[in-house]
Amino acid sequence: MEDDWEALAEQKAEQLFAKADVNKWAGEDEDDVKDNWEDDDEEEEKKDAPKQEDTPTKNAKPKKAAQQKKLKKEDLERLQREEEEFANMTPEQQLAEKRRLQKLQEENDLKTAMETLGITPMSTGNGIDGMHPTTKEEFTELAEAISKKLANYRASTEYQGFLEELLLKLFASLSSNNIRKAKTTLDNLYLEKQKVEKGDKPKKTKGIKVKAKLRVEGENTTLNEYETKYDDYDDYDDFM
């Protein structure tokens, strides 16, 4: 009887051992379960995390297109206003407006050409007001620009007085030494101008003076030194 019980116990033990996973160490099943839990948590976090869409890139194109459309509309409205204003102008105003637009176009063309050639302008503004010279070359450019500007008024009767008034105001802030240097420069210019003006007119002469020494043939004695003068009158008439 005891043998039967022992045999039955061994049989049950074998069945239980066969069902167990002999390749697993103790606690490995718990690790597998834990790893599975972590994987599930990561998948849930990925699902719960907000999807990062390329919304800035997608929205940038429509936004840029809308801005371009708006700018184009504003340009059209501005052109329409300018056309209406131009139509309401007098012929003189229209001519002045055309000249202004032409000047702006020329300035833009010049600016484009300078940028193409890599030429850096002396200033960021336009015209004399935009010039801010610091070097000798830049001051020379400023002087030329002012000279060209004033050249438009040379024919005016007030031009001479304007220059005198301008010089007084400009030289008032200079020292006496600098004024003397400027005066020397003007004096030299005056002399050069005077030479040019005199060269255009024939010189007038009232008479020619001739001095000579006469010698008697065969002798070394000087008889006399005399002077003959030819003037506007005749010597014979004077003798008579």
Swiss-Prot record:
Residues 28-45 have a biased composition (Acidic residues). Residues 60-71 have a biased composition (Basic residues). Component of the eukaryotic translation initiation factor 3 (eIF-3) complex, which is involved in protein synthesis of a specialized repertoire of mRNAs and, together with other initiation factors, stimulates binding of mRNA and methionyl-tRNAi to the 40S ribosome. The eIF-3 complex specifically targets and initiates translation of a subset of mRNAs involved in cell proliferation. It holds the Pfam family eIF3_subunit. Residues 19-95 are annotated as: Disordered. HAMAP family: eIF3j (MF_03009). GO terms for biological process: formation of cytoplasmic translation initiation complex. One of its GO terms (molecular function) is translation initiation factor activity. It is found in: Cytoplasm. GO terms for cellular component: eukaryotic 43S preinitiation complex; eukaryotic 48S preinitiation complex; eukaryotic translation initiation factor 3 complex. It comes from the Eukaryota. This is Eukaryotic translation initiation factor 3 subunit J. Residues 46-56, 72-81 have a biased composition (Basic and acidic residues). InterPro entries: eIF3-like_dom_sf (IPR023194), eIF3j (IPR013906).
